[in-house]
Every structure is written in C-alpha cells, then in structure tokens.
UniProtKB/Swiss-Prot annotation:
InterPro entries: Glyco_hydro_32_AS, Glyco_hydro_32_N, Glyco_hydro_beta-prop_sf. The gene is SUC7. This is Invertase 7. Its EC number is 3.2.1.26. Substrate binds at residues 39-42, 60. SUPFAM superfamilies: Arabinanase/levansucrase/invertase. It is an enzyme of class 3 (hydrolase). Glycans are attached at residues 23, 64, 76. Belongs to the glycosyl hydrolase 32 family. Pfam families: Glyco_hydro_32N (PF00251). One of its GO terms (cellular component) is extracellular region. Residues 1-19 form the signal peptide.
Length: 96
C-alpha cells in the first residue's frame, strides 16, 4: 500500500516536471524555487503546517538587485502537499 502511494506520488512529480520542461524559454531551474526577479538568499524555515495543510518557505529577498543589499525583505511562500508548486504570492516583511 505504501509502495503504491509512493509510486503514484513519484509519477505525479514526473508528469509535472515533464510539463515544465516544455518551457524552453526559461532560464530558471525546474525544481529549485526562485523568484521572478531580484536576489534571494538560501531558503530557510521550511516547515509543514498540518492545521492548514501547507508547506511554508522563508527566505531573504532583494527585489531591486541581483546581489545582497538593501532594501531587504523576509518572504513567506506557501504550497500544498506536493511541495513543488508554490503560490506566487509573496507575504513580505521588510528587514530594518
């Protein structure tokens, strides 16, 4: 039973990644999270909220440059149980 669930989940990931690979115009990685523009630090604080059924990912973000610097923001992104497709909605808090 557990093996069947794992195979089903793996097949779902493979289908989603295959669909992403058809976008040959993008220079963004297929699996690693990246913002649409700007600089981001390494992801931190990845945790699962069982109450909401969502994964949370936190990282520092500079929307105005491709290197670290001010203004700097903490960003929280969320995803469902697949942990592959994140909601493109930044919840931002400025670092002061």
């Amino acid at each position: 039973m557990l093996l069947q669930a794992f195979i089903f989940l793996l097949a779902g990931f493979a289908a989603k990644i295959s669909a992403l690979m058809t976008n040959e115009t993008s220079d963004r990685p297929l699996v690693h999270f990246t913002p649409n523009k700007g600089w981001m630090n390494d992801p931190n604080g990845l945790w699962y909220d069982a109450k909401e059924g969502k994964w949370h990912l936190y990282f520092q973000y500079n929307p105005n440059d491709t290197v670290w610097g001010l203004p700097l923001f903490w960003v929280n992104m969320t995803t469902g149980v697949d942990n592959l497709f994140y909601i493109d909605k930044f919840q931002v808090r400025e670092v002061k």
